[in-house]
């Protein structure tokens, strides 16, 4: 009867297996490196005697078995030639933080970019060596897997805002003004522009605690936009449709505290050349929708107001604004680029000021509201036209 041996004292189960002969011709299986190590440089074998025997490697190669390449020092590296992998960039060459350094473009790809074509479509090659070329005659896309395109969510919010704000009102005016939204500031603090956590334009919630909206633009930006719009008028002079029409007006707007009904301010516009009254309206603000545009020079505010015709009030005006306005009328909207000189007749101690403004006004508001009530696609098309006009102006500053 054999003596009992505790399990922790027993030898491993493979201890009695026969050992392979020492003169075996079979090479050791290849050892693969981790992704962080160059696979062209294999790890060192455990048996240096086996690696140092060139006859065994030659026999193994003749037998069809894989033998990884061996490099011995710098001499082996020179014989093997340059590695097929791109060399990693050291921290000293990448700004000190090991960041990615892009490859240099070849002359061909650089030339293709100057020709207005993508370098990928002209010079990039697939693994099989074929050059990618764009296909011609492809079928148009259908919008989605359901062959329908959803309503633009931004335009949808703007449309719902306008329809809800204008409900029950007549003589509605819809305008969009460029400006800057400022943070709330205490007395003595320097106001600054708000900074929202977004990378694209964003509709600011109505209950967000932002500060005032400065509805003026820089005088250099005013000049840039004036030149841009003038060039657009000249370039579109022969277009059968979609032309931009230019006109100019010089008006003196006098503002009074309120009308007989006391609902809003009264504005009386007079022609600066002859002093004739052009318009007298009672303006009342209904609602505003604020849009923040990160990375752009200005934000914009969409306002719904009412302008009700009224009689010219008596008495002295509270303030007077002299407006030199360049008007650019398009299909559904008009861009008003205005240089304003303001004064306060009631207080001579307040010095006059000069400012510059840009606003976009919807031309046919009743037609827009009718399209919105009918829930037609034309409603979104008009709004998209107005919004895109504002975006194009802001992007070209």
Curated annotation (Swiss-Prot):
UniProt-recorded Gene Ontology molecular function terms: mRNA 5'-triphosphate monophosphatase activity; polynucleotide 5'-phosphatase activity
Predominant cellular place of this UniProt entry's protein: nucleus
Keyword Hydrolase among record annotations: yes
Disordered: region residues: 1-149
UniProt KW Ligase keyword: no
Family per similarity comment: Belongs to the fungal TPase family.
Main function: First step of mRNA capping. Converts the 5'-triphosphate end of a nascent mRNA chain into a diphosphate end.
Name the record gives this protein: mRNA-capping enzyme subunit beta
The organism of origin for this protein: Cryptococcus neoformans var. neoformans serotype D (strain JEC21 / ATCC MYA-565) (Filobasidiella neoformans)
Species classification: Eukaryota, Fungi, Dikarya, Basidiomycota, Agaricomycotina
Gene name as annotated: CET1
